[in-house]
Regions:
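Bacterial Sec-dependent N-terminal signal peptides
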Residues: 1-40, 143-154, 423
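Short glycine/proline/serine/threonine-rich loop/turn segments at secondary-structure transition edges
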Residues: 116-127
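Extracellular glycan-recognition modules
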Residues: 156-234, 325-329
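Extracellular, beta-strand-rich glycan-interacting domains
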Residues: 180-192, 308-333, 345-358
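Short, aromatic/His-centered strand-loop micro-motif at the edge of beta-sheets
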Residues: 238-260
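Flexible glycan-contacting loops in extracellular carbohydrate-active proteins
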Residues: 282-314, 339-344
């Protein structure tokens, strides 16, 4: 588990403080900075040092405490969703003294205990916002330098669904959506990258536009690896988003390694991100993108006829937004996000399931109309964390197509399926 000490106050220098004395934390002064460290299984320690800008003729008694408001402010300023570290994960002495004639107290030692397995599996960064104040308000604090955030980053683990052969994963919507700005994101790990003129589907969302009262199925998005027409490397995501024309990513994917894939449409400006880096940009062909409820988003195959062969496509942390997420928001919240975050329309963690039955297309591979022939199938069902959307499901072409659900996998971007940092 890694930790991060951060303070967001540019150019604070205690030597420049004039007027009445001020109280602050020595570590929280200067330019905005971060210090990372590893907390081993047997725990670790970190120290902070309360300081005043000018010596006093008397002892100054201090209180060191956890400031939840400082964490709220940090999250707002940095587009993060850090959650408060439980008090079972840390210990420190809350009292300190700056002796008369001195400007610093003895260092305050914070003992940190590693995150539990369950805390790691939430995906949330657990943060400890440490602050200092004078007892009895005997001295004002130096605003912006009186607190810092100690952030314990989890090693992200999850149970993972694997799509194989003649099957696909589908997240349907409760209603059709017409959106001028939106975001789709997922964690993705392909077991291998095909060679040759073979197309496989990372994800697709069937949409439509209306022309003369007729629905034309051409909107939404499709993200492919490879192209049946050839000429596109199978490691490069290609396809079309909101009728923007075929685009090809400049960033190759790697087999058996976790990637964060995102499409952001901001009022018609489209960006494909791979691990927070721009794969390509494009312009939407329409003022708004329409998504069809019965199709939602499909993963692994365009249909149950299958084109994955022996591949296994692994997914988790699937999210669909009615807002354009910034690259900072994408990068800071890869492994978890609060289910009540504004603009979050659907959130399928895919980390647990129930077994049940669902209606899927019968003779047709795509639900493009309400009267599409449907048939009932046994399946896995995956809850939407927001409660706004129906369960996601797996459609398989035959009972011989297996369900594969692998527990406790490290899903960190850049790590292999076996949990090793890729070279």
């Amino acid at each position: 588990m890694t930790g991060l000490v951060s303070c967001d106050n540019a150019e604070l220098k205690y030597d420049d403080v004039t007027g009445p004395g001020r109280l602050f934390l020595n570590e929280a002064v200067g330019t905005a900075k971060s210090v990372s460290f590893v907390i081993p299984d047997d725990g670790s320690v970190y120290t902070v040092t309360p300081r005043i800008s000018k010596p006093l003729g008397r002892d100054l008694k201090l209180t060191v405490y956890v400031d939840e408001k400082a964490l709220d402010e940090y999250n707002k300023q940095n587009n993060t969703s850090y959650t408060l570290l439980p008090n079972t994960n840390y210990e420190f002495e809350s009292s300190a003294v700056i002796p008369a004639g001195k400007v610093v107290s003895n260092p305050v030692t914070i003992t940190l205990h590693p995150l539990t397995t369950e805390q790691n599996k939430t995906g949330f960064v657990h943060a400890l916002p440490i602050a200092v104040k004078a007892e009895g308000e005997a001295m004002q604090v130096l605003e912006g330098a009186d607190a810092f955030v100690l952030a314990a980053t989890p090693v992200p683990y999850s149970n993972v669904v694997e799509i194989t052969g003649n099957s696909y994963l589908q997240t349907r919507f409760a209603e059709d959506y017409k959106l001028s700005s939106w975001t789709f994101e997922t964690l993705f790990n392909p077991s291998q990258i095909y060679t040759g003129n073979t197309t496989t589907w990372l994800a697709s969302a069937i949409g439509y536009y209306e022309q003369g009262g007729t629905k034309i199925i051409q909107d939404g998005f499709m993200l492919r690896l490879g192209d049946s027409g050839g000429g596109t490397k199978n490691s490069l995501i290609n396809g079309m988003v909101s009728r923007s024309g075929k685009q090809i990513s400049s960033i190759p994917l790697q087999s058996n390694i976790w990637h964060h894939i995102a499409i952001v449409c901001d009022e018609g400006d489209i960006t494909l991100y791979v691990n927070g880096n721009v794969g390509y940009t494009a312009k939407s062909g329409y003022a708004a993108t329409q998504f069809y409820a019965l199709n939602g988003i499909r993963f692994g195959n365009e249909s149950a006829s299958g084109n994955l062969g022996s591949l296994r496509y692994r997914y988790c942390q699937v999210r669909f937004w009615s807002v354009a997420r910034s690259v900072e928001e994408l990068n800071n919240n890869r492994y978890a996000v609060p289910a009540d975050t504004p603009g979050l329309l659907g959130y399928w963690k895919l980390n647990e399931y129930t077994e049940g039955k669902a209606m899927v297309p019968g003779s047709s591979v795509k639900c493009i109309e309400e009267d599409t022939p449907m048939t009932e199938t046994e399946t896995y069902l995956f809850k939407d964390a927001t409660g706004k959307q129906p369960d996601a499901l797996i459609h398989r072409a035959s009972a011989n197509t297996p369900y594969i659900f692998t527990p406790d996998k490290r899903i960190e971007v850049g790590y292999t399926w076996d949990g090793v940092l890729a070279q």
